[in-house]
Regions:
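Low-complexity, polybasic segments enriched for Lys interleaved with small residues
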Residues: 5-10
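Hydrophobic/aromatic hotspots within intrinsically disordered, low-complexity regions
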Residues: 1, 12, 16, 21, ...
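Structured aminoacyl-transfer and RNA-binding surfaces used for tRNA recognition/handling
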Residues: 31-407
Length: 407
């Protein structure tokens, strides 16, 4: 697809991008390879023929199934201890279900293509409770900061479980989600890229610490065929990556840059870039992707959020570990909802609480548990680390390549 003429990103551009990123029911039946619309909002490979092509043919797991479970426990403890130490967090309980009326569920992106599971509960009630299974605890966590009386510099993490029914199920995308969802209170003066980078660096230190702990118990995880994660990750703005690879869609840009820089944090996900598309769709009511910032070279940028991605030497593919960011304040919440045409969200209690300064300013994110285990334990598929439902075809494709998904 030819690159469109660069233009200054803005509200009109963001609205246009949102309109182009239609829900699956509205989208064209066929998207040409290289079309930047194809992966705006959607994780997953999208066809099992493609999955067959990309999975390694020479895979041999380093740890067997029993050893893998032991290593998962070691890595899990190391990450949770590290989060508490590096970010001053405490563990709190997290809901699996929330009320629909609260507006606290996570819709993941802004095109409406990933809807939560709705159901009624409360046998014997005159009016049953309209509830939803959480897709992530993103918005709930910010409310929890107030509930638990967190001061700036204090925060919480949760052992979050969720269901995302609208994902394509492949080797690294599942309908069952296990995350360390975390949130930390902050002050207004921390709403800048320097603070964001410091938090990301602390998170990376936690991940590397977990890698070392797993390797203490299982030294053979230090395998030259599958290099360890780098000691430090590098920061790039989505706009900078677009300038480096202007003709590639988002996932291919990520794949290219990760081959040279195997651990990166991509800043500014959600704002419309110079080619007229956001790097990826991002919901308008938690991460701040609208705030103006400046690149290392002095160029105008936007966004106080991003993703941690690494190169997976087993699958030879991009591998996302975390999505996070400084959260919207009352001004940027309204700006972003106006851009996405969702000002009606302001009626919900969560959004009203932000507008009325009833919730702390915060930074937070989600770290995929099975995704971290997959990276640290040099696995080819999420299903080697977590138990969920997979189509039989995926079981067969994986088994033919010595990848055995748990049942």
């Amino acid at each position: 697809m030819k690159r469109k003429a660069a233009r200054k990103p803005g509200r009109c551009g963001a609205r246009a991008a949102a309109a182009r990123a239609k829900s699956p029911a509205e989208a064209p039946a066929v998207l040409v390879k290289g079309d930047k619309r194809a992966d705006l909002a959607g994780p997953g490979v999208s066809t099992y023929e493609e999955v067959e092509k990309i999975l390694p043919a020479d895979y041999a797991p380093i740890l067997d199934r029993k050893e893998t479970q032991i290593a998962i426990r070691i890595a899990k403890d190391a990450v949770e201890d590290g989060l508490c130490r590096e970010l001053n967090l405490i563990r709190v309980e997290c809901p699996l279900i929330v009320t629909k009326a609260s507006g606290v569920n996570d819709y993941l992106d802004r095109d409406g293509s990933r809807t939560p599971i709705d159901f009624s509960c409360g046998l014997g009630l005159e009016r049953r409770i309209e509830a939803q299974v959480v897709q992530a605890a993103t918005k709930w966590k910010r409310m929890a900061l107030a509930q638990f009386g967190m001061e700036p510099g204090e925060g919480l993490y949760t052992d979050m479980r969720a269901v995302r029914k609208d994902y394509f199920l492949d080797h690294d995308h599942s309908s069952y989600v296990d995350q360390w969802d975390w949130e930390r209170a902050m002050v207004a003066s921390d709403r800048n890229l320097g603070f964001l980078r410091d938090v990301v660096a602390r998170l990376w230190k936690v991940v590397k610490g977990a890698e070392r702990e797993a390797q203490k118990r299982f030294p053979r995880l230090r395998n030259p065929r599958y290099p360890d994660l780098p000691e430090e990750l590098e920061f790039f703005h989505a706009e900078e990556i677009l300038e480096m690879y202007p003709d590639l869609p988002r996932k291919q840009r990520e794949t290219r840059i990760l081959q040279e820089h195997p651990a990166i944090f991509i800043i500014g996900i959600g704002w419309t870039l110079k080619d007229g598309y956001p790097h990826e769709m991002r919901a308008a009511d938690y991460d701040d992707w609208v705030t103006p910032t400046t690149s290392k070279s002095g160029g105008p940028m936007h966004g106080l959020n991003g993703d941690i991605l690494v190169w997976n030497p087993v699958t030879k593919r991009r591998h996302e570990l975390s999505s996070m960011g400084i959260r919207v304040n009352k001004h940027t919440l309204r700006q972003q909802l106006e851009i996405t045409g969702q000002l009606d969200f302001l009626k919900f209690p969560y959004h009203q609480a932000i507008l009325n300064d009833e919730l702390p300013l915060s930074v937070g994110g989600g770290i995929g548990q099975s995704r971290v285990y997959q990276a640290l334990l040099k696995k080819a598929a999420l299903g080697e680390c977590s138990v969920t439902v997979w189509p039989e075809r995926l079981h067969e494709i994986c088994a033919a390549r010595n990848i055995h998904l748990l049942r």
